[in-house]
Amino acid sequence: MTQMTDAKSGIITEEMKFVANEEGMDVETLKNLIAKGYVVIPKNVNRNTKPVGIGDNLRTKVNVNLGTSPDFVDIACELKKVEISNKYGADAIMDLSTGGNLPEIRKEIIKNTNLPIGTVPIYEVGVDAKQKYGRVIDMDEDLIFNVIERQAKEGVDFMTLHCGITKQTVNALNNDPRKMGVVSRGGAFLTAYIMYHDRENPLYKEFDYLLELLKEHDVTLSLGDGMRPGCLQDNTDRAQIQELITLGELVDKCREQGVQVMVEGPGHVPYNNIEANMKIQKTVCKNAPFYVLGPIVTDLAPGYDHITAAIGGTLAAVSGANFLCYVTPAEHVRLMKEDDVKEGLIASKIAAQAADVAKGHSIAWKLEKEMADARIKHDWDRQFEIALDSDKPRKMREEIPSKDEKACSVCGDYCALLMVEELGKR
């Protein structure tokens, strides 16, 4: 049984009750959204995961990517990133490790959080294939599905799988060449496999078998966008749209089998094209939850891509995206460090909150009202409690204090609020 099959059968699960309470919504309404495939609750039956709802009519959620690389392996560092994710309000974590003992790293990450955990299994497949055969492109079907099954048994809650990379998609790429080609790592693994062997993508060819594996453990399938644009010039091209059409067809198959599914979206999109991209996805994929990376709205800001992504993420979420994958200041430059994780997470949470306010979500507006009330009362402790990051503003206030405890050091005796407040008391 999955959350979706239960919902279709009219069963309200404990996870549905928890999410409905968190979202401030009627549980029957939530159940119906899950039954239709408009909402997912990524929760592997083998793990005691905190239930998190992703999809329409819910708050916008934020994911944190972390993980090792071939150039830097430090489990303690990754666990610190997990700690930061837990502390500053991430809704999910993805382990994208490609260096070191991948199963051991994943085990430690899972052990140190109750947030939903996602992976990209093709990374481990590629690493194993290179170690075993000498090349990533020599991976075989058995290796692919063995890794997926093993990760499902370990408790992974959602998996990014690039099932929409097909021979037809690769042809679309070849017939309409891009500036940046394929920038998705998992997408590149499978594109290279198809081009070298002239074989169909096993994840597409054996999609029914894949669904059996995922359904057994109620792993949510996150359909990866292997043809996402890697620069603004490549946005919304034929390869991207061809893959999206395929993903829409696969969403139908998932729903027929009762497998929870969401769809991943583009990374580099000009601001004026974001709304159209969201509407195309929601139409083609029939309102499946949409999970976007950014989108990044300019390629000119390495070192500041948490900002470019937050700008794009706000509009994306207002226009239909349900799940924002954070982007850190280190994007396009190096592996993220602990401070990068915090900066990226807070930036993405700002985008999510701004979008939820624009969409009129009651919880988002409740928080805004509480902040205004705290500011009117000059209640600095309460302001910092409500803030998305309480530590930074508290430290900043301590660095240059005001003589007046109610004011801040920008205005001091000339505080606008205090001046009018004093006059009102006369």
Swiss-Prot record:
Keywords: 4Fe-4S, Iron, Iron-sulfur, Lyase, Metal-binding, S-adenosyl-L-methionine, Thiamine biosynthesis, Zinc. It is an enzyme of class 4 (lyase). Its cofactor is [4Fe-4S] cluster. Binds 1 [4Fe-4S] cluster per subunit. The cluster is coordinated with 3 cysteines and an exchangeable S-adenosyl-L-methionine. GO terms for biological process: thiamine biosynthetic process; thiamine diphosphate biosynthetic process. InterPro entries: ThiC, ThiC/Bza_core_dom, ThiC/BzaA/B. Gene3D superfamilies: Radical SAM ThiC family, central domain. Its EC number is 4.1.99.17. The keyword Zinc applies. Substrate binds at N65, M94, Y123, H162, S184, R185, G186, D225, G226, M227, R228, E264, Y291. Pfam families: ThiC_Rad_SAM. One of its GO terms (molecular function) is zinc ion binding. It comes from the Archaea. Catalyzes the synthesis of the hydroxymethylpyrimidine phosphate (HMP-P) moiety of thiamine from aminoimidazole ribotide (AIR) in a radical S-adenosyl-L-methionine (SAM)-dependent reaction. This is Phosphomethylpyrimidine synthase. It comes from Methanococcus maripaludis (strain C7 / ATCC BAA-1331).
